[in-house]
């Protein structure tokens, strides 16, 4: 064996020793962390428990476990009332109550000592000397301990079921205050509060009160007419696993067995009680909650199909695209509902009042179909009073009364455009005088001099003449005064 082999063996032994030392030090560190910070272990265990889907084991684990605990409690109470209770006196008698061998007076007299010794040797019926009563005494202690564990477990399950599953919802769009003890009104400023910093500044009693009672302390009074408010709903939502465990390991059955003389006929009442409770809660009430969820989902899907999807489909997106004649003016979103009599009701949401307002039947502005709008863009749409104007052309709000009053004169001027050409009136620039254009409005076909005369006698003569001329001469008037 060479020197290199010896060096390699020594090197290998050092690695093994180092690994053993590292493993020992790692175990020492783990034990030290476990002893110094046991809350870390509790945190790890809670994380593992929370990651388990307990609702999947509601039927396979919770219900059989609860029934087993109830049957175990029934058997223990049955043995206590029929086996331990008749021998209660013999089990609780003191072993040294009639021990004559411990009497100093009897030891002074020899004949009395002989009588007492012969009496004790002939009577071996004391409970402490019999193996039967020793076994019963052991069973009595075991039954008491088991009853205490089962009562504590049932109390924990009941409290966890009734007070341990609450979720808080902030309702910002609820307007009507319902008569529910779980619904409270709060101010919007409460959302920006730093609760724990405010609590730490208070007294020790306030801190203990908060951590034991949670955030259920009564807050400041909120004005009923205040606008910046929201409702907070604290809803009780137990899990399916806990519901089945509570029903199968019911506190009513445990209380009944604890305060009554249990016999074999009591099993009939327990079986009937378990069946009725399971039928009412799991097969009726819980399924009713699931049916309400189905109805809510169906109503939400119907609203989405009729109101939401109808407004974001492909045709609606095409209608909102800009065209050469400009986009149409937007109308407020109209929601269609029906009354109890079957009448159609159209409502629009008022953002200032924050409520829906019903639209009159004669003044509803429902946008037309796409084909109708395309036809209107190509020509002149007819309006009431036998007036016409090009669709897509929007006047200025200040000038609209004047054009509305003079629209009849413009129609007459449109019919006699050839006569205006013979009069030698000035026309707008970029206008083909030989062939009238389709896109020209009736006002642009009227001579400039005639329009200026109408302005001088109207209520708009206070305007600057340069502004009026620029408005009338501008070829991009439609673009500048297009209502967006």
UniProtKB/Swiss-Prot annotation:
Location(s), subcellular: Nucleus membrane
Region span, Disordered: 416-458
UniProt KW Transmembrane helix keyword: yes
Regions that span the bilayer: 145-165, 252-272
Phosphoserine modified-residue sites: 3, 417, 474
Alphabetized InterPro entries for the sequence: Nur1/Mug154
Main location: nucleus
Subunit structure, interactors included: Interacts with CSM1.
Function description: Member of a perinuclear network that controls recombination at multiple loci to maintain genome stability. Required for rDNA repeat stability.
Listed name of the protein: Nuclear rim protein 1
């Amino acid at each position: 064996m060479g020197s290199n082999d010896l060096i390699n063996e020594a090197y290998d032994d050092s690695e093994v020793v180092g690994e053993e030392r590292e493993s020992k030090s790692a175990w020492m560190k783990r034990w030290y962390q476990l002893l110094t910070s046991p809350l870390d272990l509790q945190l790890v265990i809670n994380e593992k428990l929370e990651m388990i889907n307990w609702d999947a084991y509601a039927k396979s684990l919770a219900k059989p476990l609860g029934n087993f605990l109830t049957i175990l409690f029934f058997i223990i109470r049955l043995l206590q009332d029929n086996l331990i209770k008749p021998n209660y006196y013999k089990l609780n008698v003191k072993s040294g109550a009639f021990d004559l061998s411990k009497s100093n007076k009897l030891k002074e007299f020899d004949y009395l000592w002989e009588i007492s010794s012969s009496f004790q040797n002939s009577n071996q019926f004391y409970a402490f000397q019999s193996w039967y009563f020793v076994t019963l005494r052991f069973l009595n202690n075991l039954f008491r301990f088991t009853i205490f564990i089962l009562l504590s477990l049932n109390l924990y399950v009941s409290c966890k079921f009734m007070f341990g599953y609450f979720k808080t919802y902030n309702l910002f769009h609820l307007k009507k205050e319902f008569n529910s003890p779980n619904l409270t009104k709060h101010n919007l400023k409460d959302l920006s509060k730093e609760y724990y910093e405010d609590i730490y500044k208070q007294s020790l009693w306030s801190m203990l009160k908060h951590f034991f009672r949670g955030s259920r302390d009564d807050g400041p009074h909120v004005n009923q007419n205040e606008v910046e408010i929201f409702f907070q709903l604290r809803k009780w939502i137990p899990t399916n696993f806990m519901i089945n465990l509570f029903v199968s390991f019911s506190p009513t059955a445990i209380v009944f067995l604890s305060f009554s003389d249990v016999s074999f006929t009591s099993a009939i009442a327990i079986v009937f009680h378990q069946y009725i409770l399971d039928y009412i809660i799991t097969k009726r009430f819980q399924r009713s909650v699931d049916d309400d969820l189905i109805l809510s989902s169906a109503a939400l899907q119907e609203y989405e199909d009729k109101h939401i999807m109808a407004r974001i489909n492909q045709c609606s997106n095409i209608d909102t695209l800009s065209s050469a004649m400009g986009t149409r003016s937007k109308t407020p979103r109209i929601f269609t509902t029906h009354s109890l009599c079957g009448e159609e009701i159209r409502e629009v949401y008022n953002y200032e009042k924050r409520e829906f307002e019903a639209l009159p039947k004669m003044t509803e502005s429902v946008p037309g179909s796409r084909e109708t709008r395309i036809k209107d863009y190509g020509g002149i749409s007819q309006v009431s009073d036998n007036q016409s104007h090009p669709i897509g052309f929007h006047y200025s709000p200040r000038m609209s009364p004047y054009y509305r009053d003079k629209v009849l004169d413009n129609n007459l001027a449109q019919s006699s455009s050839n006569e205006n050409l013979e009069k030698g009136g000035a026309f707008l620039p970029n206008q083909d005088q030989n062939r009238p254009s389709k896109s020209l409005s009736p006002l642009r076909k009227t001579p400039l001099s005639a329009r200026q005369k109408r302005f001088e006698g109207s209520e708009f003569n206070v305007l600057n003449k340069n502004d009026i001329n620029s408005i009338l001469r501008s070829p991009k008037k439609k673009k500048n005064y297009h209502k967006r």
